[in-house]
Amino acid sequence: MKRLPFLLLCLVLLTGCSTKKNTSGSRFWHSFTARFNTYHNGSEAYKEGMIAKETGNKDNYTEMLPFFMIGNTKSAQLGASNFETAITKCEKAIHLHSIKKKPVLSANKTRSPKTKAYLQRKEFNPFLKHAWLLMGRAQYQKGDFVAAASTFSYITRLYAAEPIVANEARLWMARSYTAMDWYYDAEDALGRALRDTIPSSLRQTLNDTQADLFLSQGKYEEAVPLLQKAAKAERRKLPKARLYFLLGQVHRELGHKQEAYKALRKCLKQNPPYELAFNARILQTEVLADAKTARKMVSRLQRMARSNNNKDYLDQVYYAMGNIYMAQNDTARAIGAYEKGRQKGTRSGIEKGVLLLRLAGIYWEQTDYEKAQKCYAEALGMIDKEYDGYADIARRSKILDELVPYTSAVRLQDSLLWLSTT
């Protein structure tokens, strides 16, 4: 009986804090509970997912790196279970703590413009915007871009009376559209966001979203200043090194050799993991190689080939060497370098696959179809079906598989005929 008053008090408080009522007390209670219970757990799960994605990510340095790691197909599912937990927690927070009912105000009280704007809101729990945004980000990082775009689109309508929240959602909506190659929709979302003044808290989000879009569209000139800003703003060493490597790749694509070299040097200054540092040094030799420096760059690569630290990367070393020779129109030496990479490379991944494709292309141009067929057949087992031009490569390989028995027979007959006449 002594506990009855306490239980009655708790019952009264809980009744007063129903989401069907909109009072200062109910808003405080549901904001506090959402933040420090379900949302907190979801936020921690999201952080763990991001750590798993960053530590487990494996970039393909033979291609232009995606701005965001979610762009790597093989890394897309890293941290997926953590992001799913974050989504579930956010959904629970929204379900339990959303306050849609408008507050009751005195009919005689004069309503200021601020009060009128407040009453235009569709969600009155002041903290739930964080749960909505976290849910959308978790869907994006999980790779469910359609769901993410849908969530962010809903946020722009739900928080139309709060421009900062709506614009943050538009920026993430643009990222989601970019990830699906829906560039028109991404540009439209960005355009809508830019109609309002972007606060300083969202400037970097805007910068990175635009950089990702320009890179995905192949607009490298426009992407350069945004990449520079992103790399400079990044404080963590590994992501910073990765962005400088990407900047080096972009400058190389644009023919800006000195700028590419400087960006790669900044990448190396971050003391990145060995594989990233190795690829940065490889790319440095390629961007600096010209008629005057080609021999020096080849010598540098030969020293790298002799280093025991690089024994697992010999396919890349000789691939870079072959590329330098090809740039000097020395096809014979290029073939020699590529063949060495083919023989000495111990891996069976995309790096060796790219080397084999380059070698196969040369043999194809020289009408040496037997060698081309072997290179294409071997390369197909090392590249993914998502590789650019995979369908054409597979078709050419199939043609050669059918053609080579006949060309081999013709060559044999020619050899026998030659022997019979000597």
Q: What residues fall within each predicted segment?
A:
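Sec-dependent N-terminal signal peptides
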Residues: L4-L13
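Acidic, polar-rich low-complexity tracts and alpha-helical solenoid repeat scaffolds
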Residues: G16-T422
